Amino acid sequence: MEIEVLAERAQLTVEQVKAIESDGPLPGLAPLIKIARVLGVRLGTFLDDQQSVGAVVSRAQDERESVRFSNHAAEGHENMIYHSLSEGKDNRHLEPFVIDILPDQNPKFDLSTHEGEEFIYVLDGQVEINYGKNTYVLEKGDSIYYDSIVKHHVHGYNGQKARILAVIYTPI
């Protein structure tokens, strides 16, 4: 499939698709979800290459960085580190991650939207979630569950670092 066709079907710009292909900082999870939907593959296809039909166990001592994303679609710095908790699980529909949100003093960010649902549980720090016209501040132990088709953005409250558990469901 040509890059222009992929971009159009995924409702992305050609520049966004080229940035993803170039192995530079990824602009966020939403563009990958949109591309996966267009290609008819699961999101995990882009994140890991080993497949297991049975149970997949993630051990704390084995935690490793899966992928880094920028919280700002137009900028190149990365401030979200995703640790996959389902790496290698074949045919999964849920994508559980522990996400380290790094300090970021840039107040500008782009809201994202994609099909599916998200559940977020705050493990450490505080996060601010813009969801539609609402803003929620969550502290350690708080959680939120929402439809991700509504425009949303997750970041550290007042630019501070935080750590969350995020479970993302994306229909294929």
Question: For the regions a protein language model found, what residue spans apply to each?
Answer:
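Conserved short histidine dyad/triad with adjacent acidic residue
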Residues: D62-H72, E78-G88, P96-H114, S148-K151
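DNA major-groove recognition helix of helix-turn-helix/homeodomain DNA-binding modules
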Residues: A30-T45
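Short alpha-helical DNA-recognition segment
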Residues: M1-A19
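Residue-level signal for the short linker/turn that defines the boundary of a DNA-recognition helix
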Residues: M1, L12, P27-A30, Y136
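Glycine- and acidic-residue-biased ligand/ion/polar-headgroup-sensing regions
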Residues: H114-G132
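Short amphipathic recognition helices of helix-turn-helix/homeodomain-type DNA-binding modules
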Residues: T45-V56
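Ligand-binding loop in jelly-roll beta-barrel domains
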Residues: E78-I81, E139-K140, S148-I172
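Short acidic-glycine-tyrosine-enriched beta hairpin
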Residues: L85, G132-S148
